[in-house]
Curated annotation (Swiss-Prot):
Assembly notes: Heterooctamer of four alpha and four beta subunits.
Cofactor note: Binds 1 pyruvoyl group covalently per subunit.
Identification of the protein by name: Aspartate 1-decarboxylase
One Gene Ontology CC term in the entry: cytosol
Family stated for the protein in its record: Belongs to the PanD family.
Length: 139
């Protein structure tokens, strides 16, 4: 059996521009693509932290070191410059692949530069103001 697992995540990136009159996709700085193990043309889910919008599209490689996170085409109606987003890619894996695979989790700063790389999808970096779901307790 194959399971759909998170393989890559770029967490809390800032949208740098949105262009309604483009053929579609999301443009992402090549440095971020490398860090997250994402390829041009790969399907991603975009989650807008500011307004809750979720959409699927594909990745276009942007200029290395530019910090670009560009929302292109119809998605520009849902996601706007300045919004914080999470980009997530999933992969189909068998049980052996799941046991051996470490997802790529990339945290970025306000200029979309990688500041922390990891593999725990629930990790909240120290000083980020985020809470890991692993730290929640229930009475």
């Amino acid at each position: 059996m194959l399971r759909t697992m998170m393989k890559s995540k770029i967490h809390r990136a800032t949208v740098t521009h949105a262009d309604l009159h483009y053929v579609g996709s999301v443009t992402v700085d090549q440095d971020l693509l490398d860090a997250a193990d994402l390829l041009e043309g790969e399907q991603v889910c975009i989650v807008d932290i500011d307004n809750g919008a979720r959409l699927e599209t594909y990745v276009i490689a942007g200029e290395r070191g530019s910090g670009v996170i560009g929302i292109n085409g119809a998605a520009a109606h849902l996601v706007h410059p300045g919004d914080l987003v999470i980009l997530i890619a999933y992969g189909m894996m068998n049980e052996q692949e799941i046991a051996e695979y470490d997802p790529k989790v990339v945290f970025v700063d306000e200029r979309n530069r990688p500041v922390e790389l990891g593999s725990d999808p629930a990790h909240a970096p120290e000083g980020s103001g985020l809470t890991s779901p692993r730290s929640l307790t229930f009475a």
